[in-house]
Amino acid sequence: MQQIQRDIAQALQVQPPFQSEADVQAQIARRIAFIQQCLKDAGLKTLVLGISGGVDSLTAGLLAQRAVEQLREQTGDQAYRFIAVRLPYQVQQDEADAQASLATIRADEEQTVNIGPSVKALAEQLEALEGLEPAKSDFVIGNIKARIRMVAQYAIAGARGGLVIGTDHAAEAVMGFFTKFGDGACDLAPLSGLAKHQVRALARALGAPENLVEKIPTADLEDLRPGHPDEASHGVTYAEIDAFLHGQPLREEAARVIVDTYHKTQHKRELPKAP
């Protein structure tokens, strides 16, 4: 099992555990520089990111805002901007957390796009949903929500000449816990390679309030299971996932779940197949 852990960690470019606050600050600096270089390479000056109220988008948003602020200071070009986007489906259960995230990030610009009408309009036109059991239909519509959010972010980025930031990190990547061509679609993923507790460490160091740093993670895509915790979907805890990624001991059953899920979701981490 240890060899499998090492192979998967290498494939996901998992970063080693932080040993000190200096390690955390080094990762923050590295990832801000990465964001800045992505903008320079693309010849663009705008970043777009959906803010959900969870620690992942909060952390990515804090990094993005710092990146453009530093670029403005370094270059004197005030055109560098970060647009934080709220993408609620009707009324979001944890909207207060989303608003607290926005207040923490203090993005250059905030936009809100309620995806409810678009999701409902599309669902009503899909004959494939007819006759499905409620749980299956709810799951499919949940993925529609994630993909409509992607469409909205890319529309804003296209209109404003920007790049879309993703929030994927190693603990989600290993479980394939994202919607293919939904929240998995982005131009840059500045949290890539980090375990979940490392994302929290970055958030904490960037000044995020503790209640948001330690908030129970939820994708919150299904109407029939609002606020359903990620860990309940995984069947393992983030602590166990992080331990697996860092080659540390964990329950045999938990390790088996992670490995099986990793292989089952491999298609999500690959480019489309071609002949």
Curated annotation (Swiss-Prot):
Gene3D superfamilies: HUPs. Mg(2+) binds at D56, E172. CDD domains: NAD_synthase (cd00553). Keywords: ATP-binding, Ligase, Magnesium, Metal-binding, NAD, Nucleotide-binding. It catalyses: deamido-NAD(+) + NH4(+) + ATP = AMP + diphosphate + NAD(+) + H(+). Catalyzes the ATP-dependent amidation of deamido-NAD to form NAD. Uses ammonia as a nitrogen source. Belongs to the NAD synthetase family. This is NH(3)-dependent NAD(+) synthetase. The lineage of its organism: Bacteria, Pseudomonadati, Pseudomonadota, Gammaproteobacteria, Pseudomonadales.
